[in-house]
Swiss-Prot record:
GO terms for molecular function: calcium ion binding; calmodulin binding. This is Calmodulin regulator protein PCP4. Residues 28-40 are annotated as: Acidic. It comes from Bos taurus (Bovine). Keywords: Calmodulin-binding. Transmembrane segments: none annotated. GO terms for biological process: positive regulation of CAMKK-AMPK signaling cascade; positive regulation of neuron differentiation. Mostly intrinsically disordered, with residual structure localized to the IQ domain which mediates the interaction with calmodulin. The gene is PCP4. Belongs to the PCP4 family. Residues 1-40 are annotated as: Disordered.
Length: 62
């Protein structure tokens, strides 16, 4: 769900990459309620997927 662009694609702004070097990139702040039930469910789902990944990774290295 990220909005990354592939190499060589343009977004309509024809600026050289070095032109924005002097500008600071402002990072968007998020206010996440860590006690919300949907946040807890999301965290459990992410942790579950990560554990599966770790198990698969460990199995393929042996």
């Amino acid at each position: 769900m990220s909005e990354r662009q592939g190499a060589g694609t343009t977004n309509g702004k024809d600026k050289p990459s070095g032109e924005n070097d002097g500008q600071k990139k402002v990072q968007e702040e998020f206010d996440i309620d860590m006690d919300a039930p949907e946040t807890e469910r999301a965290a459990v789902a992410i942790q579950s997927q990560f554990r599966k990944f770790q198990k698969k990774k460990a199995g393929s290295q042996s």
